[in-house]
């Protein structure tokens, strides 16, 4: 059975959808109507019209009252879910551990294949302790919430109420939080320490 022609999008609507996808891929969040108006050299009303048609046809989802409230829900070539919104919940130290307050400060759009079926959150990193794992100062890391992790996983760990991102090393009774920077030493978890795994790092975005 062929696709319903009501779901077909025009070249101008395709151009708009492609620009939203490009913008999200580059910056991690969708453009505003004003930004798209400037990009295409058209009026705000024309941008709204394109967005309304894409929402009606199921290619976009719009959250009312937000300037950056667009989410791409499918692509005409794949007809597959493309992006999901993940909450940003603060800053985690990637050097010296600091307390991370789980206050939601915003959202970032992430490929659905990265998130999978789990619940995720995002955090900005500070410091250079994980540079050899490709995690640099200021990166936004995507974390899948899970209370346990395996040896070798990069995790967000809460150690005595201080959060840090490190590689988890488990060797019999020995547990260490290992930096990916040869200049820094591992943090050995002592029996009296309170260690809690907040989640596993599954991706990152360089904003």
UniProtKB/Swiss-Prot annotation:
Sorted UniProt keywords: Autocatalytic cleavage, DNA damage, DNA repair, DNA replication, DNA-binding, Hydrolase, Repressor, SOS response, Transcription, Transcription regulation
Q: Which domain of life is it from?
A: Bacteria
Binding region for DNA: 33-52
Please indicate which residues carry the site annotation Cleavage: 94-95
Query: Does the UniProt entry include the keyword Zinc-finger?
Result: no
Location of the active site: 129 (for autocatalytic cleavage activity), 166 (for autocatalytic cleavage activity)
Q: Can you tell me which family this protein belongs to?
A: Belongs to the peptidase S24 family.
* Cited function: Represses a number of genes involved in the response to DNA damage (SOS response), including recA and lexA. In the presence of single-stranded DNA, RecA interacts with LexA causing an autocatalytic cleavage which disrupts the DNA-binding part of LexA, leading to derepression of the SOS regulon and eventually DNA repair.
Q: What name appears for this protein in its UniProt entry?
A: LexA repressor
Please give the organism.
Answer: Oleidesulfovibrio alaskensis (strain ATCC BAA-1058 / DSM 17464 / G20)
Originating gene? lexA
